[in-house]
A protein has these predicted regions:
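Early exported N-terminus immediately downstream of N-terminal targeting peptides
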Residues: 31, 38-90
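Sec-dependent signal peptide recognition
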Residues: 2-9
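Structured, beta-strand-rich domain cores
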Residues: 123-127, 153
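Bacterial Sec signal peptide processing site at the extreme N-terminus
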Residues: 10-33
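A mature extracytoplasmic/lumenal domain signature
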Residues: 116-120, 129-131, 139, 144-148, ...
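Polybasic, proline/glycine-rich intrinsically disordered low-complexity segments
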Residues: 149-199
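Terminal low-complexity "docking" segments
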Residues: 23-29, 69-118, 127
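Envelope-exposed proteins and targeting segments
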Residues: 110, 127-131, 136-140, 173-175
Length: 199
């Protein structure tokens, strides 16, 4: 596995509306969006210098994604919620080929963005997981804006996120993301992201 994986930095981004992006879909299906996003403001876009393009093997991407776990925050009086995998096996089956292709064509000013819609529970409520990734200083940054967030309407849950996968549907609630390899916390934030992430 690439040495780069040892330098993973991860953040949970919740409740942040984010700046104005242009999203260019690479894979655009009813239940999946993978694409490239950059600042709409060209002066901001040219200031971003991510380490793209880059080629990840599908095996490396699978090894990273399957080890990401989230423990979402609750209220002050709530007990700790159990850890959940960020991506289901079905999510990874859909995501990995598209991420593999998209990282290879991403430019330094781009973020790789994703959104996956699915149903869960007896009610088959529509949910979305969305966010983005970028490579900087030989470290992969992963931003999770929504994690299995219930979609209340087509406008909020589908159209808004297709326009900007960094758009969060919920209020700031914080959370922890873990990389299972060491089962230790790599990074924790609430309402923000790591490094030179979108602001």
């Amino acid at each position: 596995m690439k040495r780069i994986i040892a330098g993973i930095l991860i953040a949970l981004c919740v409740g942040c509306a984010g700046p104005v992006f242009v999203t260019r879909p690479i894979e655009d299906e009813p239940s999946l969006l993978v694409g490239l996003a950059s600042y709409n403001d060209q002066s901001k876009a040219t200031a971003i210098r991510h380490d793209h393009p880059v080629e990840w093997s599908k095996a490396d991407l699978h090894a990273i994604l399957k080890r990401l776990f989230i423990q979402e925050g609750g209220g002050l009086m709530d007990s700790a919620r159990p850890r959940q995998a960020v991506f289901s096996p079905e999510d990874m089956t859909s995501l990995i080929p598209s991420l593999h292709k998209t990282f290879k064509i991403a430019q330094p000013s781009d973020w790789i963005v994703f959104a996956i819609w699915g149903s869960s529970g007896k009610s088959q409520t529509l949910e979305v997981t969305s966010g983005g990734m970028f490579l900087e200083d030989q470290r992969l940054h992963i931003i999770v804006a929504n994690h299995r967030e219930r979609v209340s309407s087509a406008k909020d849950g589908i159209h808004a996120i297709r326009s900007n996968p960094f758009h969060s549907l919920s209020d700031v609630k914080g959370g922890l993301i873990f990389f299972q390899a060491a089962m230790s916390l790599i990074h924790e934030t609430a309402g923000s992201s790591v490094g030179s992430n979108p602001r």
